[in-house]
Amino acid sequence: LGPGRPTVLVPLAVLEGESLPNGTAELLANARVVLLGYHVIPEQTATEQAREQFGETAMSKLEEFAAALAAAGADVETRLVFTHDEATTIDRLIYEHDCLAVLVPNSAPQVDSVLVALRGTVGIGRNTRLVAGLFADAGVAVTLYHVSGEGESPEDGESFLGGVRSDLVERGIASDRIETLVEDSDAPLDAIADRAESHDAVVMGETDPSVTTFVFGMPSEQIAERFLGPVLVVQRARPEE
């Protein structure tokens, strides 16, 4: 039994001209994609009014992107939201659809190698579920990357990554496609960004608060300068309600 399809949220500001980047459909061919078209409207504008005015245009774009994702093999669900607050909307959809990850959409003409940046043990199962779910059948090279923390020896890092590797192999990724790499750095984000340059896509967790700011807190131009490819941000498990 292969891994189930991981659910990935793809938020696009459709009316700002944001489209599905080149290669996204191939990257997410084995996913269940929640394609979120959103448009941020001024406080004083009612969402119903915005929907009446722009809904049709936005929906036709969204459907075009959904068709491209489906043609590559993904299961797709579309949502169109007019909102006063983008972050809250994205968060709500992650929760409603139980999304394993959110895609920061950048183009990836082809994905041959993925950097999986792992900090701590929290939520590791979610990372491996995503990586195996997306890439088990794709022949992609996977690099598991860990920046050692305070008081952690290189051996600790290696044994941590060894466990992650075994989990991936169990989930269907060929062991000869997995490399492990442990580095020491005072600036983990810089280290990740530097490593990312030699890969086509990055998978990282949101458990490290600086990661979320790295992805959503900086203007996307800055991320694009640091890393030009797509970033999959694995969400932490939500407390059961």
Where are these regions (language model features)?
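A conditional alpha-helix N-cap/helix-loop micro-motif detector
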Residues: 17, 58, 83, 124, ...
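Small/aliphatic-rich secondary-structure junction motif
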Residues: 1-48, 113-159, 165-178, 187, ...
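Short beta->alpha junction loops
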Residues: 77-84, 178-186
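Short glycine/serine/threonine/alanine-rich loop segments
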Residues: 33, 74, 99, 140, ...
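Structured cytosolic domains appended to multi-pass membrane proteins
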Residues: 37-123
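Gly/Ser-rich helix-loop-strand patches that form or flank binding pockets
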Residues: 83-134, 196-241
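Short, aromatic/basic amphipathic alpha-helical patches
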Residues: 25, 50-57, 61-68, 156-170, ...
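A short, acidic, amphipathic alpha-helical segment used as a generic capping/interface helix at domain edges
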Residues: 165-166, 184-196
